[in-house]
């Protein structure tokens, strides 16, 4: 080019105001709401987990007192409900079962190759809302908890699980498969011992395919977000039909809070004459709906009033609430955070350790032994290159920076 920017280099807060106004119109329609499942109460100790004292016990949406946060979040994705009954969905598509094999361990019909990085795992908070980095050394320990439990009538926690996988927020259990995680597979009708499989990712564990070393997990964690309790990757079984949410109401709530935060102290008037300005009360009200549905503490007016604090909270919530929903790729780019995020080494547990080497297994290491584990990002990658054939057809076009 002639030194002219094709994209304005001047920040325009009115665009955030327009986004906030659009999100608020969707909220005010009253057509959508966060999906929730009622609290489960029984005398067997297998119902809804007690709320930490840091989480409001008021009824939803002012707290999480009358809902089961684990089932409320999990059932948005696992096919428990027909899509027409989930008011959170704004737009969705039918989902293929093909990628389930990436999640399932080899022993129950998968190849266990979907590996979640340690950086992602460490973003999940403790049940009481503390960051994992604020957990005690005992809570971060590799040692076995030593006792089993069941909650939400269906989720079983093995006594062999590490302390670091205990007492985490409900979305952790709804989303992550970890070492000694139990995969129910209740629809299995065969004679093999495949139901309630306690999966391990050790070198000699039961998650990998002994005949093909490529079919194994690389970090010791996988994704279970789209796996129903009935699902199992075996022909003598069934799988729940599922949809993939392309847009859901939680996006509207987080988007509204983010847009209001980015307006700073300026105020704007929309085409209908409405005044749009940063409102911490509104930010807290709608942001906290997402937090309460997840069984997490709400944020305060003081936190919402501080721009940098709120920005960090918003980014964290986007990352966890929308984990493995094809959002992170775009969020990192629109925030211009991709360079830092992708130029970090991939970390995970030491899956080369054997079952007799438990402490070594839970030692966090950098995985860079295979080509596809080495990732990089340069600033030119914020834009895609223009195809050479297109450039040759139109001499007035200019290649995007860095792609010459």
What are these regions (language model features)?
Residues 2, 249, 256-258, 263:
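Structural register within alpha-helical repeat arrays
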Residues 135-146:
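Extended, non-transmembrane interaction/recognition domains
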């Amino acid at each position: 080019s002639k030194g002219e920017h094709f994209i304005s280099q001047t920040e325009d807060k009115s665009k955030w105001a327009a986004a906030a106004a659009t999100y608020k119109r969707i909220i005010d329609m009253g057509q959508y709401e966060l999906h929730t499942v009622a609290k489960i109460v029984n005398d067997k100790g297998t119902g809804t987990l007690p709320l930490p004292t840091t989480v409001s016990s008021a009824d939803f949406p002012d707290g999480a007192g009358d809902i089961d946060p684990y089932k409320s979040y999990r059932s948005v994705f696992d096919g428990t409900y027909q899509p027409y009954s989930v008011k959170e969905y704004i737009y969705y598509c039918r989902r293929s079962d093909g990628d389930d094999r990436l999640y399932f361990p080899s022993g129950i019909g998968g190849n266990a190759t979907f590996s979640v990085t340690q950086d992602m795992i460490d973003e999940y908070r403790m049940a009481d809302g503390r960051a994992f980095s604020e957990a005690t050394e005992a809570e971060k320990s590799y040692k076995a908890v030593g006792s089993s439990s069941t909650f939400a009538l269906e989720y079983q926690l093995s006594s062999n699980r590490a302390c670091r996988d205990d007492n985490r927020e409900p979305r952790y259990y709804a989303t992550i498969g970890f070492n000694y995680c139990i995969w129910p597979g209740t629809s299995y009708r065969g004679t093999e011992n495949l139901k309630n499989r306690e999966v391990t990712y050790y070198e000699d564990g039961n998650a990998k395919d002994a005949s093909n070393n490529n079919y194994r997990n690389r970090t010791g964690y996988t994704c279970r977000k789209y796996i129903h309790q009935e699902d199992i990757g075996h022909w003598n079984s069934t799988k729940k039909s599922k949809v993939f949410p392309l847009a859901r109401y939680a996006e509207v709530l987080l988007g509204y809070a983010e847009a209001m935060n980015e307006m700073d102290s300026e105020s704007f008037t929309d085409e209908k004459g409405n005044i749009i300005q940063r409102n911490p009360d509104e930010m807290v009200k709608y942001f906290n709906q997402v937090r309460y549905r997840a069984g997490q503490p709400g944020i305060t007016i003081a936190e919402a009033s501080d721009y940098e604090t709120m920005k960090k909270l918003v980014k964290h919530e986007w990352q966890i609430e929308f984990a493995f929903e094809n959002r992170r790729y775009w969020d990192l780019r629109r925030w211009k955070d991709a360079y830092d995020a992708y130029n970090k080494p991939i970390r995970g547990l030491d899956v080369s350790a054997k079952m007799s080497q438990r402490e070594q297994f839970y030692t966090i290491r950098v995985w860079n032994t295979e080509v596809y584990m080495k990732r990089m990002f340069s600033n030119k990658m914020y834009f895609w290159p223009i195809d050479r054939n297109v450039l040759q057809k139109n001499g007035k076009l200019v290649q995007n920076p860095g792609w010459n």
